[in-house]
């Protein structure tokens, strides 16, 4: 069965236009792969350095960098003609982040990786929101945004269930390698889409 059909069968009554369907499908996959790791981050970092303060510090680096860079990048992003390409670039960056996790060897590498993840989020999150918002309708925007948020929440929960089993059975390396491959695939998919679709 086609992945987009599965996603669309879960989405409630109101049908999304083609652009929104693509964005929901692609970004739901990204949310899913990110959520495969976040519940197990502390366990992963404790293997590198058995210090809970380092776990907290290293995780804090990602959202703080993402937040600061979102402020700095947003004015520049407004000038970018094809903002969906920023989304593709952010997926490529996240692919590099997950590959770095697969070969993680030190706390300094972890901090660098978290900074890089912040860069990817600062490029991708506003680009997704702007692109998605541009394709919503005034009268249906609550439903259209609600469908995206609902899918993201379900994907987050399912990812935690699946990844716990994957980590237990095959370890972090294969989880991160898969996450990296999917991220790069999503970036290529968005990059190669005809521009008029997004």
Mark where each language-model region is.
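Structural signature of the two symmetry-related core transmembrane helices
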Residues: 85-99, 180
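Intracellular juxtamembrane helix-capping segments at the cytosolic ends
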Residues: 123-136
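Helix-loop boundary and gating motifs at the non-cytosolic
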Residues: 9-63
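A membrane-interface helix-boundary motif in multi-pass transporters
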Residues: 165-183
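Loop-to-transmembrane helix entry/capping segments in MFS-fold secondary transporters
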Residues: 52-53, 138-148
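Residue-level signature of mid-helix packing/kink "hotspots" within the transmembrane helices
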Residues: 63-71, 156-157
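Helix-to-loop junctions at the C-terminal end of transmembrane segments
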Residues: 69-82, 167
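Helix-loop junctions at membrane interfaces in 12-TM secondary transporters
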Residues: 102-113
